[in-house]
Amino acid sequence: MAEISVTFEDGATERFPAGTSAAEALRAHAARNGALQRALKRAIAARTDGSEPAVIDLARPLFADCRLAPVAPESPEGLSVLRHSTAHLMAQAVKRLFPQVEITIGPVIENGFYYDFRRPEGFTPEDLARIEETMRAIVREDLAVAREEVARAEAIRRFRAMGEHYKVEIIEGLPDDRVSLYQQGEFVDLCRGPHVPSTGHLAAFRLTSVAGAYWRGDARNEQLQRIYGTAWARKEDLEAYLARLEEAKQRDHRRLGQALDLFSLHPIAPGSPFFHPKGALVYNTLVQYIRSLYARYGYTEVITPLIYKTELYKQSGHYDLFREDMFLIAVEEEEYGVKPMNCPGHCYLFATRKHSYRDLPIRYADFSRLHRFEASGTLAGLVRVRSMAQDDAHIFCTPDQLDDEIERFVAMTREVYAAFGFDRIEVTLQTRPEKFLGAVERWDTAEAALRRALERTGFAVTVLAGQGAFYGPKIGFDFRDVLERSWTLATVQIDCAMPERFELGYVTPEGSTATPVMIHRAVLGSLERFIAILLEQTAGKLPLWLAPVQVRLLPISEKVADYAARAVDACRAAGLRAEADLRGEKLGYKVREAQLEKIPVIAVVGEREAAAGAVAPRREGAAEAALPLDDFIARTVAEARMPGGAS
């Protein structure tokens, strides 16, 4: 009988008959290794590092030499297996409770999983509770999970007999002659695996929500019911995650936007937020802050059209690649596109004048509104919208200026994130994808420039090979928030295609014409999305300089209302955004309401303060000593100064 060599984590190598399962090989070696025995008791899968590295079922037979290790449930690979198996567990419970339901797909996602079902009447919260109860019953049954490979035609026959038409459609689209099925008790599913050895390994899970989803993500197809869940290796991990979820609900920018009267969303304009006066003030103050940086970093602001003939996007290359995400309009037998990005218009703007190398770099900044068609099912508050503005800019420079421009952008990004206390930044370099525009040589030069700039900045960088945009490599700055979520904020990309497509040029010192380098860059990205992230990061307690109401005066009684009103006027004259609560409510009520509205500075005014021309400040719920009004205003003005000293 043929034999294979298996090397274990401790470096030892043993020989086994071909076809020995991963579990058998691990158990045999564990008999001589106490540490491996303990690891194997908790293992839910195995990791191989042979000709085809993979995480596999413990029961999977081995037919080639490999390295082999157990996979612990709390490891990243183990959590993926747990969550995938819990998705199957949920589907089995749904089929037990609702036999007429058809199953579709159930992948792993960040922190959990989902499964899509066809059930026209949908699922209620009561249904989810019953499904979860049935899942726990199946866990107690500790059903063995078995893998089987069958001919594609046989798999089609089986699923057709079960009435699982979506599975039949999936299998018919697979290129392989054989497919793998997984079975636990009466439940069978099409799956590549791997999975836990038995359902008894799945103890820490919770179903979290249900939502609509279209089959294959296409709105033209039938709507399905998507049940989301989460699964963890330990119950304490699950409880910690659920606590974070509850915290996320309290920090949800949609809830805060309504509670703080910042913005609202309405069906009349899907994906296009209404910014209320307070929200517009936050929005415009952000723009003012970025404009103050533009003045220091040498940007010139431009205003470009909102609607262009689609010839522009055909020339830029966006029409073929981005058309499905555009709002297109037919007028006077011409096709127009509502602007989804600024870069083609900035190329046209650059071409309106002849440029010398002495003119470069040229840095165009643009806060124009952009519109992109996002499917209705993907819209999410301010995070995913159809109407937005960005702190968008495009730089046209010579090749010799490229490194310096990237470093200047990184410096500006550092300054902005420091202003908001965003200190957990991870940097990625995204390189040439399979489908790209422009010459390979331009891509290589651009990627090298980005690498050099990052090396000089001192950031630790993760390279994401093949994940650049179709027109150029990209640096992304990912911010990890208080809820451990990662958000891509700043991006800088070198365009390897558009300058040539628009035949852009500048006169060199030798008098010849050369193509400029074009850089796309944004620090905040979408202003709408940045506001959402900032609200959730701060739980609505915006920095003093950005708060829509910076100071609220609270008179104790009507006797001092006139003084409170005069104090507000003095605050406003000094540039503070101040107001007074002149209602006849009790002081405690007014203080509590101001705290709920996240007012940064509260100042109480009683008869003693009015007589002395003073106020009694309160911050973070704590009372401070009374201050003369002028001193209070001076201190607050200094604290409310915009970062970087801008006014």
Task: List each model region and its residues.
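NTP/phosphate- and nucleic-acid-binding module
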Residues: 1-104, 110-647
